[in-house]
Amino acid sequence: MVPKTIIEKIWDEHVVYREDGKPDLLYIDLHLVHEVTSPQAFEGLRQKGRKVRRPDLTFATMDHNVPTINRSVVEDEVAKNQMTALERNCREFGVPLADLNSPEQGIVHVIGPELGLTQPGKTIVCGDSHTSTHGAFGALAFGIGTSEVEHVLATQTLWQHRPKTMQVNVTGSLAPGVSAKDVILAIIGKFGVDFGTGYVLEFTGDVIRRMSMEERMTICNMSIEAGARAGLIAPDDVTFAYLKERKYAPKGEAFEQAVEKWKQLCTDEGAVYDRVVHIDGSEIAPTVTWGTTPAMSSPIDGTVPDPNEFATETERKAVQLALQYMGLKPGTKMTDIAVQHVFIGSCTNSRISDLREAAQIVKGKKVAPGVRALVVPGSQQVKKQAEEEGIAQTFIDAGFEWRDSGCSMCLGMNPDTVPAGEHCASTSNRNFEGRQGKGARTHLVSPAMAAAAAIYGHFVDVRTLYKEVVR
């Protein structure tokens, strides 16, 4: 038998129909739905007189547009209409929905794992680019467009071109204060925003294996920012322990049988990737983006680069335009960049471990004058747990705003935005022009780095604040 990568194993297991020179027809195990990319898809079914083929393999929630302060009032008409439409569509087509009043509501890429819907070996799709998050469980998960959402609703299948495979091997150990967010920013910073184009990435190596499931989700979440179709990590005992007793995960003997099957989901010895890249985790520092792509970043002890340092005219122009938008000058120390806003949240970094990491920095301190700081849990379950652990009170005592769950300030399509010309330390995944609001200047960082920026009013090296043992 020819050795296979885990990517090839999952793909081949789900091919319904294959024809040379054409896309494969894949079976989809889990379809996650939210209010923004689904209305037209459901309307398409309605117009054609079709039903949702597998409502039992479909799960919906409201996240992108939801208010995070007063949920009883949705002032934006577009947002209100989208949420009303999702509620109506789920009721009509029999799709389970975690609405604003549900204790299971949250960001779709947070609740999928915490409810146990996300499982190793599954094909998972959602009308959202950061569906790659679920790859942390050894699933093949990727975002799709609205027309594809309709196709999956109607057929539980999807036409897809077979991707190339890439191993991203992260060796060594991380220093205290260096997080999964720093690892993925360092990878993108080293190899670029398009090095993964046409590939599914498998993250391997000692650094990855030592990570918790929530750290692995951060890594896979930003695979798309490297241009990849998806990213995944082979499941192991960490994965199985996380899933045990989750609401929708198998129970009892069925769980043990599932684990035995999941253990086969690994890349065979001798399997050949289309490409292999390496990065030494020991060399990674806390990282801050200074530009308008996730690749435009520097270690915290670095400086804003000079456009003239770049090799090509295209690169020089891109850096020049980015610095102009960000209002930064070459040579500025990263620690001298002041922030007016801090956002701890998003599908990248809003889980309980992220909030614990940030609270550790914040405890006993106060938010700096002139800084507005928000903490937005990724789900109502995360919110409840943080409140029970006293983490929420730590943030409140420090002067942070403590919110309900939702996508919030990650994207400028709800009430939580950053004013033009102001800088935000954000634990989200994208720093494009206008991402957090028209003219907003976004710096991507880890939860610890964001928390420290809130306290000091500028970026600081969190390694000086940590006294933990090296992972």
Curated annotation (Swiss-Prot):
Swiss-Prot/TrEMBL catalytic activity: (2R,3S)-3-isopropylmalate = (2S)-2-isopropylmalate
One Pfam short name: Aconitase
Enzyme superclass (EC): lyase
GO MF term (any one): metal ion binding
Cofactor(s) needed by this chain: [4Fe-4S] cluster
UniProt superkingdom: Bacteria
UniProtKB keywords: 4Fe-4S, Amino-acid biosynthesis, Branched-chain amino acid biosynthesis, Iron, Iron-sulfur, Leucine biosynthesis, Lyase, Metal-binding
CDD domains registered for this protein in UniProt: IPMI
SUPFAM superfamilies in alphabetical order: Aconitase iron-sulfur domain
Cofactor notes: Binds 1 [4Fe-4S] cluster per subunit.
Residues given in the record as [4Fe-4S] cluster binding sites: C347, C407, C410
Function: Catalyzes the isomerization between 2-isopropylmalate and 3-isopropylmalate, via the formation of 2-isopropylmaleate.
Protein name (database record): 3-isopropylmalate dehydratase large subunit
Provenance organism: Anoxybacillus flavithermus (strain DSM 21510 / WK1)
